[in-house]
Amino acid sequence: MADNKANKEQVHRVFQNISKKYDRLNNIISFEQHKVWRKRVMKDMGVRKGTKALDVCCGTGDWTIALSKAVGPTGEVTGIDFSENMLEVGKEKTASMENVKLVHGDAMELPFGDNSFDYVTIGFGLRNVPDYLVALKEMNRVLKPGGMVVCLETSQPTLPAFKQMYALYFKFVMPIFGKLFAKSKEEYEWLQQSTFNFPGKEELKRMFEEAGFINVRVRSFTGGVAAMHLGYKEKDNTKGD
C-alpha cells in the first residue's frame, strides 16, 4: 500500500507539472499517431447516439471530446482524472460542449454507482494507475451489463524490426523530447518508465478477463507500439425470470 501511495503521489506531481505541455508532447512523442489510433478505435466502437459514456483518466479531454460528438446532444459523457491541472485544460477545451462533465477523482475508486454507463474508455492512462487490475475492476463495476469497455494504450511490439526500433526510440529519442518539454528529470523518466514497463497485449488481455470482461479482443497499431483492448460486461440474464 505504501508503494502504491508513493507511486500515486509521483504520478500526480508529474501530470500537475506537465499539463499545459501535455497535448504538444503527446503529439510529438507519438508523431501524432495517437489521433489516428483513436479514430480507428472509435470506428470499432460504433458508439450509439443518446448513450452514457465514461472516460477514465481523461486528462486534457481528447477522447472525451470524441465521445461527446459520438453520443450527440441527447447523450452524456463524463470524464474523470486525478490531476486538477489536466482537468483545467480539459475544461477549457470542452467549455462549449453541454453534454460533457469533467470531475476530479481516482480511477481505482470511481465515484459512480454500479451499472451507470454504456461505454467506459481509458486512453493512455492505465499505465499511470498504480494497480491496473483494481482500475479495470472498477471500470467493470460502473459499466452497465452488456456495456462496452475500451482501452487504448501503448504496448510492447512483437515484430523484431519494431522491437529494435522501439528500444532505440526509448533509449535515445524519448529522453530528448522529455528534457525539452518536462520541467524535471522525474517527469521525463516517468514517461519513459510507465510506457516501457506496461504489460504486453496478451498479458493485458488476461487482466481484462480477470476483471470480469468477456469477448475481449485486441487490435495492434503501428507494428504493436499501441494496442486496443475492447471487451464487454456480461449481460444480466436473470431479469424477467
Curated annotation (Swiss-Prot):
Pathway listed for it is:
Quinol/quinone metabolism; menaquinone biosynthesis; menaquinol from 1,4-dihydroxy-2-naphthoate: step 2/2
Q: Please give the Gene3D superfamilies that the UniProt record associates with this protein.
A: Vaccinia Virus protein VP39
- Protein's UniProt keywords contain S-adenosyl-L-methionine: yes
- For this chain's UniProt record, which GO biological process terms are given? menaquinone biosynthetic process; methylation
- According to UniProt, the name of this protein is Demethylmenaquinone methyltransferase
Matching HAMAP family, A to Z?
MenG_UbiE_methyltr
**Could you say which protein family the record assigns here?**
Belongs to the class I-like SAM-binding methyltransferase superfamily. MenG/UbiE family.
- Record's keyword terms, sorted: Menaquinone biosynthesis, Methyltransferase, S-adenosyl-L-methionine, Transferase
| GO function terms (MF aspect) | demethylmenaquinone methyltransferase activity
